[in-house]
């Protein structure tokens, strides 16, 4: 059904981009509500969650995302609201074969299914994706972009360096001998095919076709 395809495309893109850029867990993505998001296409968006794994005092956390020139989570979110007509309640919902939205939020275990359905359409070898892939992919991107540990921990919400290090790629510096010769940073091993960073690149290429 055409309506189902349109809904899924916009929902999936918003889910992937928000999940990637904020390094959200599936539980966090499944609990985002329209009432707790403020978005301006030209500025950015804030997302409030009443609790999360790292919010030990259950005081609630507000996350900030900037509007971007490419892979923009803000535009993807606003486009999804416009297409779906959602004005309240949970943002990410299941969609049946007739293009009807569920009243309740998508189950967190279904998010991995969505990521892998998208990957099957993009990759011939069908690597397995999860929200862990998005978190690792964002960390890959941030390290390549020059973020330090403090910036990463503050953005993602990690409370300890040990938690952050689990997601950080190993870097080796060969200086001027490195072919890329851009600071000499070379990552240990080939890029993980199931990295969220790889998924974003293929999504962008698909949109350009």
Region annotations inferred by a language model:
Residues 1-131, 141-151, 158-198, 202, ...:
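Conserved catalytic core of the tyrosine transesterase superfamily
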